[in-house]
Amino acid sequence: MFANFSSPNATGRGITGRRIAASVATAGLLVLGSLAGAGSAAADGGDVHHQGGAVATLDGLKTYDTARLDVGNGRTTNISAGLFEMSVEGGGRLQTYCIDIHNPTQNKAKYLETPWGQTSLGNNKDAGKILWILRNSYPQVGDLNALAQKSGAGQLSAKTAAAGTQVAIWRFSDGAKVEAKNRQAEKLADWLEAQAQNLQEPKTSLTLDPNAVSGKSGSKIGPVTVHTDAEKVSVAANSDATAAGIKVTDKDGQPITSVNDGTELYCDVPAGTPDGTASLTAKATTQVPVGRAFASPSKSQTQILAGSTESTISADATVNWASKGAIPSVTAEKNCSANGIDVKVSNDGDAPFTFKLGDAEHTVPAGETKTVTVPVGEDEAYDITVTGPDGFSERFQGVLDCETQGTPAPSTGGSGGTPPTSPAPSPSDTDGGTTG
């Protein structure tokens, strides 16, 4: 799921021996805070690999009708097909469709905005066609009469429009043999499938890249580039960081109060500042771009965004500094093509940095970077720790989920039996354990 995410589980040299408070009160805020004593970011089951964007909780399947899924051997099963809704942390609402038909949802599952390349969409040649469907059907097209006329469906309700849209998406996301039970919904699905064109992946709502940098005190450390679809992201350093003399600046060393897409950020650490680590947090409020993928750390079925209200988005980065010696920074990236996690260790100091990853020891010369790919099986949980001298430790946890689940084997029981791993056949279960 997306490039370069730094673990908040950093253990190292605190800026002042106490945690710098990181209170955020306004939309679009960048704050500095010590990571010393930050504790485990994965304690609640969250994936510390989130590189930025929206974080949301699944509220359930809300606007849907029925579809018929071919499960093989001449058998079909009825499944619910339509729009899910999610609540965004910090405020906002999302509407999503499923792109993982054979994997059920989990009640109140947590979801993270995720780049296509770290989901099954990354290896799907038809991923862009799904985006075309999203932009040209319900709910982006709210005039159902116009949509029905254009598609030849005759008449559509919100439920049948959502069902037809979901069915068309499944044909591209999973290669599923699926039809809408409603005749008008099926006509919409067929039209969307026939008309779909490949489009480019939409921009992220907000990320900081890279999300870990290092350097010597007495200098500007960076750059960290802002990538965002929001018009503006405000920036500020909190009071404790300001008291320590640390500033967020542009490339010319001027303090920054407002940034947008492409802005390069630097952390100006005065000479003599005790060796330490700080965090950067960018926040903004915007509509998340339609077509962004949403993946769950708990392996609930992968979703794709169909609509968004103004929502809170955020992204984090870490900054490490020292006066001399090795000055490491560590990031990790899910690499679906290599079936593993790329752990990238950079050393911006003036001495080599030796670290342990698993049972192996590696050395990064001064001014260089080393990437190690840790193999992880599909759908497997991983817990990766990088350790070094003086108690240095970075931990990365999550689940590698790069593929849709295959078609479930049909039941060997009597006629009318339900395949044991098929999507829930009853549309009455709208809070979890169901397909979209």
Show which residues each predicted segment covers.
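Secretory targeting and sorting signals
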Residues: 1-44
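N-terminal low-complexity, Pro/Thr-rich disordered segments
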Residues: 20, 38-64, 204-205, 243-245, ...
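Short, surface-exposed polybasic-aromatic patches that bind anionic ligands, especially phosphate groups
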Residues: 44-198, 298-301
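Extracellular Ig-like/FN3 beta-sandwich strand-entry sites
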Residues: 164, 262, 273-279, 352, ...
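Acidic/charged, solvent-exposed loop-and-adjacent secondary-structure segments enriched in E/D, K/R, S/T
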Residues: 178-326
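Asparagine-centered strand-capping/turn motif at beta-strand->loop junctions
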Residues: 226-228, 342-349
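Intrinsically disordered, low-complexity Pro/Gly/Ser/Thr-rich segments with frequent PxxP/GP/PP motifs
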Residues: 251-268, 360-379
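Surface-exposed, short loops/turns at beta-strand junctions within beta-sandwich domains
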Residues: 269-277, 373-383, 401
